[in-house]
């Protein structure tokens, strides 16, 4: 048993510690919420000294930023897969909206981190911002496919996603009572109403 942590530390010295810490943080995040993440606890999870953690993540904000970035990357992949075979415009937007909801449902605490108070207020984490833009671009392409004037696509996309996020959050918090079997249809209907509202 004692040999396992030693082997892990050896692997980490070759550059895998940041990835292992992000994985550990995401596991704790989903189990206990964002406030449960402690750099010292993550060091224990990874079997390393806490000083090794601080070399990669000077504070919890930097770790949260990378967790959020991972979340947005995963969301972007889901959105692209969901819309790959859909016609531009409403069909793509509905598919993306349902995928957005499913991602939030599957990883609610990560979704709350991604959609909560902005992590990148000071612009310290450009790769996080790039991941957000990559995901939201799927919705922008969807709106461009509706024939919307190019000059307003970005603004209307932002409004749409903000409204969709609100609907999804209300479902996750059980403020909107939606039975799980009916959730996809509910999101699709809400999406169509939101499209009309911002068009």
Predicted regions and their residues:
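N-terminal intrinsically disordered/low-complexity leader segments
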Residues: 1-16, 27
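Generic hydrophobic, amphipathic alpha-helix propensity
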Residues: 17-25, 42, 67-75, 79
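Helix-turn-helix
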Residues: 20, 28-62, 66
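Hydrophobic alpha-helical connector segments
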Residues: 66, 80-109, 132-134, 150, ...
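Amphipathic alpha-helical packing segments from all-alpha helical-bundle domains
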Residues: 79, 103, 121-147, 154-159, ...
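Amphipathic alpha-helical segments used for helix-helix packing
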Residues: 105-123, 169-177
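Amphipathic C-terminal alpha-helical segment
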Residues: 161-179, 194-199
